[in-house]
């Protein structure tokens, strides 16, 4: 079989202007980037304000493993197959960060014959949205540092006289706005800034990956440009010496930060291998952020097509949970059905049983033990009142006997249905039955419900997520986290939903606990207020907001050939 890059490079593409017209966009609603991609102007939202809405399908997965479950492959394959059976469909996915592209995970365009193309354009830069987020974020960091410098240098009276601005009295120990970078670089996690003569005051800071920036979450959760501007104004950059919030609006930098992102708020239109439309927008990670593409992209697509396929990052305890409790809570766009992706390899890897047997070899004991993980995720999705279809992403080494065993086992659960998907190897033809089953599931009446109400306390929300969302015995709050619960509550932010930042490699906080962990306590070491995005992040265990590169990083495989074409992406 050809590589992903070879398949992408040989694809016959529809000109993006024609693709947009087929989708229902007007020429003036598209800003073309050559013939392969276009920005979609938000004026389409006003033009279609009264349009009836399509059905939203959320794709999630079992607990991730190093073998890859194929969630994006399934999302794109399903979109292609819906088109093949005569349904008007559109995928809405996140823009890939270059951190994972050059790190371990690789690209995020799908794979095989279920891809967004050209895949190299999607995986590297696209239309520059992530760079815009980085620049806007770092402007905020530069602004707070400069304000601290000048206030410290001049004092209150002289600063106000010379600048005409109010003295903010910034507490250097309470500057909460790090800088960001779209790469994995562990050495920047903790830094001192302001070193050297006339560069201070010195204070502790750090870098996060851009996907963890609150601005990225704001981009994904804003309803329109005015909403994004208001959210950026609410960003908490620091506290003053009296413990009061200093926002981006207080600093006078919110307008400029918004100006940098004025084009980033527009989704990018691309296509799948069979010419189905795909809107790419925003890129928050699901382990350290809320892990879903934008509300704006969903809103536009739902007004133009019958079925919108979107996905939440990692397993259903991560991106799907945050899709429900954060994204849907803010958007009101309720899903009609969910697709839960699994593989035979994933279940064996999640069995918790050590074995010398190759993961591709039939192993009834590990498969049955690992099924508990899939069963947990089925029940987790069903907990939100959404019909769930299990999609088994077939690998070439899978046996018919094990596939049939798994289908029979799934049919004894709360799942609406179960289908094997060959989208990777067969493209649109490989997920036809999955498409029909998803359509039937979406036609049933979804009884969507949130996991907790807005008016629950922060501690109650944390407990509910741990105990109901993960099956934990409870939570433990560090002294710092307890103080932050009190602080955020006193500042009036207890109504916000909670975003758990934890490992994606286990339902629990411990990546070594496979399958369905029990009797564990979730350790919450700190909270982060994201007043602009509209949620409180809980840092669980040792999760990092700046990843590091591994011993065999992905960049080792990436190069250009003699013709100047990029090779090694995938």
Swiss-Prot record:
Keywords: ATP-binding, Ligase, Nucleotide-binding, One-carbon metabolism. Pathway: One-carbon metabolism; tetrahydrofolate interconversion. InterPro entries: Formate_THF_ligase, Formate_THF_ligase_CS, P-loop_NTPase. It holds the Pfam family FTHFS. SUPFAM superfamilies: P-loop containing nucleoside triphosphate hydrolases. ATP binds at residues 65-72. One of its GO terms (biological process) is tetrahydrofolate interconversion. Its EC number is 6.3.4.3. PROSITE patterns: FTHFS_1. It comes from the Bacteria. Gene3D superfamilies: Domain 2, N(10)-formyltetrahydrofolate synthetase, Formyltetrahydrofolate synthetase, domain 3, P-loop containing nucleotide triphosphate hydrolases. The keyword ATP-binding applies. The keyword ATP-binding applies. It catalyses: (6S)-5,6,7,8-tetrahydrofolate + formate + ATP = (6R)-10-formyltetrahydrofolate + ADP + phosphate. HAMAP family: FTHFS. Belongs to the formate--tetrahydrofolate ligase family. This is Formate--tetrahydrofolate ligase.
